[in-house]
């Protein structure tokens, strides 16, 4: 069948990953819960807010990298808390310095760019995001970018050189799920770079739907960290991602208006 989908490796910045679940490291009760939930998720990429997390810049304080070692995980520094391009670029440069010299040296230019518009909605400021992306790409960063679900902005971010676009499913931390599947579908159909859902996931079914739609991967934090049992939810998310990917590859049955019997009606016993 010509429309059968074949699986392709999940590749970022020249590296191939087995897990299509990326997880954040904030909002947990303590570092031990962070470690346990991350392990249960099966994630290989963990994202870290450089401005809020000690990666070695604060000597004498607990260092997240002692709990989530770069020897085991790909550390994805992000620019959470930045509200303009200048702040975001400065934060990425700091992250590169902090991660330089670690075993994950080969992935130290991989960053997650997010430039926020305001504290209330945490919507991305797409104008400042585009400005920052242009600078970071020129400086050799591999930029994964948090953006709105506007297909035109997603296209422009890919055109300036971002290696992945990460449209929000819903507002950060809301758990509302995929609020605008139509725009997301357009982005998926048009994008020439990997598309990852970022923000808004609330439970396992949200992650599955994103993967069924054709997303390369899903990034989440609050959905796991704010669950009543974060470690158990992390494991649920691991399975949800796999199930969604398999369903996408398998291809769902067509929707029909009228019933269609599972068993043939010919030759019935009379």
Swiss-Prot record:
GO terms for biological process: thiamine diphosphate biosynthetic process. Its EC number is 2.8.1.10. Keywords: Cytoplasm, Schiff base, Thiamine biosynthesis, Transferase. Its main location: cytoplasm. It catalyses: [ThiS sulfur-carrier protein]-C-terminal-Gly-aminoethanethioate + 2-iminoacetate + 1-deoxy-D-xylulose 5-phosphate = [ThiS sulfur-carrier protein]-C-terminal Gly-Gly + 2-[(2R,5Z)-2-carboxy-4-methylthiazol-5(2H)-ylidene]ethyl phosphate + 2 H2O + H(+). It holds the Pfam family ThiG. It is found in: Cytoplasm. 1-deoxy-D-xylulose 5-phosphate binds at residues 173, 199-200, 221-222. The active site is at 112 (schiff-base intermediate with dxp). Catalyzes the rearrangement of 1-deoxy-D-xylulose 5-phosphate (DXP) to produce the thiazole phosphate moiety of thiamine. Sulfur is provided by the thiocarboxylate moiety of the carrier protein ThiS. In vitro, sulfur can be provided by H(2)S. This is Thiazole synthase.
């Amino acid at each position: 069948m010509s429309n059968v989908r074949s699986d392709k490796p999940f590749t970022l910045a020249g590296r191939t990953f087995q897990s299509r679940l990326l997880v954040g490291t904030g909002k947990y009760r303590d570092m031990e819960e962070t470690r346990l939930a991350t392990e249960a998720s099966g994630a290989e990429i963990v994202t870290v807010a450089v401005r809020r997390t000690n990666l070695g810049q604060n000597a004498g304080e607990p260092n997240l990298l002692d709990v989530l070692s770069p020897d085991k995980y790909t550390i994805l520094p992000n620019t959470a808390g930045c509200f303009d391009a200048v702040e975001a670029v400065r934060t990425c440069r700091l992250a590169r310095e902090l991660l330089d010299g670690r075993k994950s040296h080969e992935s130290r230019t991989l960053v997650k760019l997010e430039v926020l518009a305001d504290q209330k909605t945490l919507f991305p400021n797409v104008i400042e995001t585009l400005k920052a992306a242009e600078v970071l790409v020129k400086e050799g960063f591999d930029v994964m970018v948090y953006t709105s679900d506007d297909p035109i902005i997603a296209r422009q971010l890919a055109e300036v050189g971002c290696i992945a676009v990460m449209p929000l499913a819903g507002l950060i931390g809301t758990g509302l799920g995929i609020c605008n599947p139509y725009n997301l579908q357009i982005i998926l159909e048009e994008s020439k770079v990997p598309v990852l859902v970022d923000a808004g996931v609330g439970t396992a079914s949200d992650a599955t739907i994103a993967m069924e739609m054709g997303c390369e991967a899903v990034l989440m934090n609050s959905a796991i960290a704010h669950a009543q049992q974060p470690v158990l939810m992390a494991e649920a998310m691991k399975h949800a991602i796999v199930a969604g990917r398999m369903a996408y590859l398998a291809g769902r049955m067509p929707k029909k208006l009228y019933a269609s019997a599972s068993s043939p009606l010919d030759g019935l016993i009379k």
